[in-house]
């Protein structure tokens, strides 16, 4: 029986103000534009461009994270990346 497979984030780069380019383990690359987001609660520090730019890949969780223990669930990131793919160069 084949289990459901969710690709994980293996690369991340800030390519604009609150815009991430994410690379997933299945080769999917997508640009995610968070510029219209107004983060609240524990995510509020992400409103600051300098804090947002400190994004790192959390290999243990398979997603992206920021200082202060902030991370985003990988499932919606993957769905957004598939909806906004970057063509291979």
Locations of regions flagged by a protein language model:
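Motif-centric detector for short Cys/His coordination patterns
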Residues: 1-89
């Amino acid at each position: 029986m084949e289990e459901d497979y969710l690709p994980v984030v293996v690369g991340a780069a800030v390519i604009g103000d609150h815009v991430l380019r994410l690379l997933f383990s299945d080769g999917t690359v997508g640009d995610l534009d968070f510029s219209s987001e107004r983060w609240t609660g524990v995510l509020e520090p992400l409103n600051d461009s300098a804090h947002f730019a400190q994004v790192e890949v959390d290999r243990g969780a398979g997603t992206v994270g920021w200082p202060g223990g902030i991370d985003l669930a990988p499932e919606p990131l993957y769905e957004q990346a598939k909806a906004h793919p970057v063509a291979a160069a």
